[in-house]
């Protein structure tokens, strides 16, 4: 979905009111600080919108810095590809203009400093979004060398960018065989990275916690049950996924619980 017919070259972000999707707040070239939590809270952000042309509700707040009317409200901050199509978006709350300066990028543009709340924009996700924008998620395994936090950020982008990247691609029909490579599964998040790519290809999403994995097995997320999952290097993965997880009145190792969830939804898990 294109954010606006007025998108220009280099504009990577678009703001739209949460209360009225016809209230478009404008484009920006950069949103520095969006992925950097402030010390006083995981979701608190101070964001520098560089090269911004504010409109609508945001424009109304620009002239009231320092007063209550500087708070524009809640919005959706979309991330745009090179053609101005929305790749994904974050809900941002209590968007407040705290500074306005002329922009060096172009006459008529301003640089806005905003305070807002956004706990879904995880640190490190900006790097993954740039890979999506540049079309660099064209082979599997790009997540292998990411830190634990980086893998979590990877999964978040895989989820938020799913609709854009799949482009209404239908689920694989029932009876398919998928192969998950267990060599790089060292913790729970790396399992989700691996199975996401096994089902949906490079940068694919197929859950990022146990409940989400179970939801994805209900169809609509890339694969139709029943299907077969060949789990390569499963012995190595089992040795890593040893965390004890509550399961009913008892608890189970994470590896065993994952297999149980898969099999309960009709997946034939072949451990190799």
Regions found by a protein language model. Name each.
Residues 2-25, 138-197:
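Extended, compositionally biased accessory segments flanking or bridging domains
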Residues 239-272:
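Helix-rich interaction surfaces within compact, conserved domain-sized segments
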